[in-house]
Regions:
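Structural detector of well-ordered beta-strand residues that form the stable sheet scaffold
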Residues: 18, 41, 101-103, 129, ...
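Mid-domain Rossmann-like dinucleotide-binding core that forms the NAD(H)/NADP(H) cofactor-binding site
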Residues: 1-66
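N-terminal Rossmann-fold cofactor-binding loop
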Residues: 43-47, 82, 132
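Glycine-rich cofactor phosphate-binding loops and adjacent beta1-alpha1 units
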Residues: 9, 51-126
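Short strand-turn motif at the edge of the Rossmann-like AdoMet-binding core
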Residues: 105-109, 131-133, 156
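Cofactor-binding loop segments of dinucleotide-utilizing enzymes, especially the Rossmann-like FAD-
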Residues: 22, 45, 107, 133, ...
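C-terminal hydrophobic helical "lid"/dimerization subdomain
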Residues: 90-94, 135-187
């Protein structure tokens, strides 16, 4: 889904891309934007994910809206919302430059309402796209992972056994965890 969303956003060389959310989708979006030749800013509250974002290609990694505005006062050419939180979806168009683009990749609970100010988007001619799964990008995504174009290794923060999975699912993730994977018979 990240690749499809980034295709929709169409980041270009020299553009500025703000990625909101430091989970797996956001960190993959950072790599894809960097591959396009964009300047990339990652917005996530987690200091561990900020560091990881910088290590995988983000030019900047910050924790607040005001930090973003300090770096890019006019806003970003492309804002990619990956957190799936009502507040960040509402914020996304406000951090785009006039004439900019927004892609919502984060999944919000079905039925949840998100306040957006249409006049601001109209006045500043912000394009907003929503992206979900697209089976036509799976082969290309797998190839990018297989050939190392996209590095997923740093996104796996913990490997757990099948026996540990129940406790891991029931417990809050450790600070900075991006993704735990289950490997049967893993000691």
């Amino acid at each position: 889904c990240t690749l499809h969303g980034m295709d929709m956003g169409a980041a270009r060389e020299g553009e500025t891309v703000l990625v909101i959310g430091g989970g797996v989708i956001g960190l993959m979006a950072v790599q894809l934007a960097k591959l396009a030749g964009a300047k990339v800013l990652l917005l996530t509250r987690s200091p561990e994910k900020q560091t990881l974002g910088l290590n995988i290609g983000a030019d900047y990694a910050v924790g607040t809206e005001s930090d973003v505005r300090d770096i890019w006062p006019e806003g970003a050419d492309l804002v990619v919302e990956c957190a799936g939180v009502s507040a960040t979806v509402t914020l996304s168009h406000k951090l785009a430059r006039s004439g900019g683009r927004v892609v919502i990749l984060g999944v919000i609970s079905q039925g949840e309402q998100v306040p957006i100010e249409p006049f601001d988007m109209l006045f500043r001619e912000i394009q907003m796209h929503f992206s979900f799964l697209n089976p036509f990008t799976h082969e290309r995504a797998a190839k990018m992972i297989a050939d190392g174009t996209i590095n997923v290794s740093p996104l796996v923060s913990r490997i757990i056994s099948l026996e540990e999975a129940v406790l891991a699912i029931a417990s809050p993730p450790p600070a900075g965890e991006v993704r735990a994977i289950v490997v049967p018979n893993h000691d």
